[in-house]
Amino acid sequence: MKTLASTFLGLLLVAMTTVVAIARADAAAGKEVFQGSDCQSCHYTQGPATEKSIDDQLAKKGPELWYAGSKFQGPWLQAWLQDPQPIRPMKFNSVMEPNPGGHPALSADQAGPVTDYLMSLTSDAVKAGTVKVKKKNLKGRLIFIKKMPCSGCHQFPTKKKFSGGLSGPSLVGAGQRLNPDWVLAYLQQPKVFKPVKMMPVFVGLLSDKDMKNVAAHVATFK
């Protein structure tokens, strides 16, 4: 019996090692495609964040991706890379100029490896399984709409279509796009991800429980 158990554990270890090796190979292939497509000219992938001033932020051409694997959901990311639609109503780093769109699209053969690469880029600040998502989170909804001015800057889905402001990234479809654990980490430790930003800091204004409710509410957005 001990021999059988040892054999099983050995095979399991080999299988796990093989899976990890394949994942690393896929990520490495994706990195080559990412760099070969010149994606790094607009998106930096080396963390942690180094911006110290508004000039540093304005020098960026596009969102940083060094924590993409903690922020995004893989299936959404792979689909978006093949058919990229604007997430921000306004151009990156602007609150006045509309987003013209036109983000380069990848082929299906390119999008898979690039997704593997981007999903390998994670932040230790994001703890998995922290946010419990339900179909409805009334406390989170009240905070999002009434207690804090989230809807003043972010579009979000409503029964009619969508509502909210235009200056921040749209949250329409956030339930499929964003990892709720990252949303919570971003609310709790915003400077880890964006040392210089326009979004208000809610640390000290909202409790951790409130932030969890907001993250859970955002996760319901379709």
What are these regions (language model features)?
Residues 31, 44-79, 155-186:
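Gly/Gly-Pro-rich "capping" loops immediately C-terminal to redox-active cysteine motifs
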Residues 1-12:
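Bacterial N-terminal signal peptides that target proteins for export
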Residues 54-70, 82-112, 129-132, 165-173, ...:
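Axial heme c-ligation environment in periplasmic c-type cytochrome domains
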Residues 25-47, 133-157:
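Sequence/structural segment immediately N-terminal to covalent heme-attachment motifs in c-type
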Residues 14-23:
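C-terminal segment of classical bacterial N-terminal signal peptides
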Residues 41, 107-129:
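Short, structured interface segments
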